[in-house]
Amino acid sequence: MIGFIRTVKPDEESIVKPTRFSDTVKRYGLRAAIITFTSEAFTLVKDALDRYEGLERVPLGCLRAVMSGEVGVFQSYFGSAASAMLMEILVAGGVKYFMVMGAAGSIKREVKAGDVVVPTWGLREEGVSYHYVKEVFMVEIEEKSIEGS
C-alpha cells in the first residue's frame, strides 16, 4: 500500500507551529543567531564570545545552544529541514539577524582548509528554499548583505 502525505490547504491552519517553541527564545531576548552544523564550528564561535550564560539544551530542535546577551549560538541537526525549522522557531521568538556557518569542499586550489568563504550565489536543486523565495534556479544575495566584508 502506498501512503501519501496530506498537504495543508491555504484555508487550513498549519500543523507545525514554531511559536510553540519560541518562548525560550523570547525569554533570553535574542536579536541575533549564529547557526552551525558542526561541533567544531559551534565550539569556535562559543569560545569567541566574551561571556556566555551557560550551555543549555533547549527544546528548539537543535543539538545545543549557548546564549550571550542578545546573541545565541546554535548547533543545528544537519540538513535543510532541521535548520529551517530551527530558524523558524528563532524568527517566531523575535530573532532578526542570522549567520549560518556550514562546511563544504572546494574545487579551487587557492581556497585552503579553514578559509572563510562567503557565497554570493547558489544553484537550487532541492531542500526547503522553495518554500521561502520565488522559484528560480539560481539565487543571489543582496549586495548590502556583504558590504564591508
Regions from the PLM with identified roles:
Residues M1-G148:
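Metabolite-binding pocket within alpha/beta catalytic cores that recognizes anionic/polar moieties
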